[in-house]
UniProtKB/Swiss-Prot annotation:
GO terms for molecular function: RNA binding. GO terms for biological process: regulation of DNA-templated transcription; regulation of RNA stability; regulation of translation, ncRNA-mediated. Homohexamer. GO terms for cellular component: cytosol. NCBIfam families: Hfq, PRK00395.1. This is RNA-binding protein Hfq. Keywords: RNA-binding, Stress response. It comes from the Bacteria. SUPFAM superfamilies: Sm-like ribonucleoproteins (SSF50182). InterPro entries: Hfq, LSM_dom_sf, Sm. RNA chaperone that binds small regulatory RNA (sRNAs) and mRNAs to facilitate mRNA translational regulation in response to envelope stress, environmental stress and changes in metabolite concentrations. Also binds with high specificity to tRNAs. Belongs to the Hfq family. Residues 10-70 form the Sm domain.
Length: 83
């Protein structure tokens, strides 16, 4: 059986979303957004801060920095088991 390759971007975003972990998103223009990731797809990320939501296009994102380190090994194993 072929294992599907791990999608690091989706695994990372899904883990911070599930853990309600605050993140700082740095945009390519230098602007910073802080908040919680509420959802994402192939092209966008929805972030919430102080009850307001913003949809940000991924091509505008430079860096996503979580408040704490993410255990990507455990996260990728659990996402593989969910398939």
């Amino acid at each position: 059986m072929n294992k599907a390759p791990i999608n690091l971007q989706d695994t990372f975003l899904n883990q911070v979303r599930k853990e309600n972990m605050p993140v700082t998103i740095y945009l390519v223009n230098g602007f910073q957004l802080k908040g919680l990731v509420r959802g994402f797809d192939n092209f966008t990320v929805v972030i919430e801060f102080e009850g307001k939501q913003q949809m940000v296009y991924k091509h505008a994102i430079s860096t996503v920095m979580p408040l704490r380190p993410i255990n990507l090994v455990a996260a990728s194993q659990s996402s593989t088991e969910e398939r």
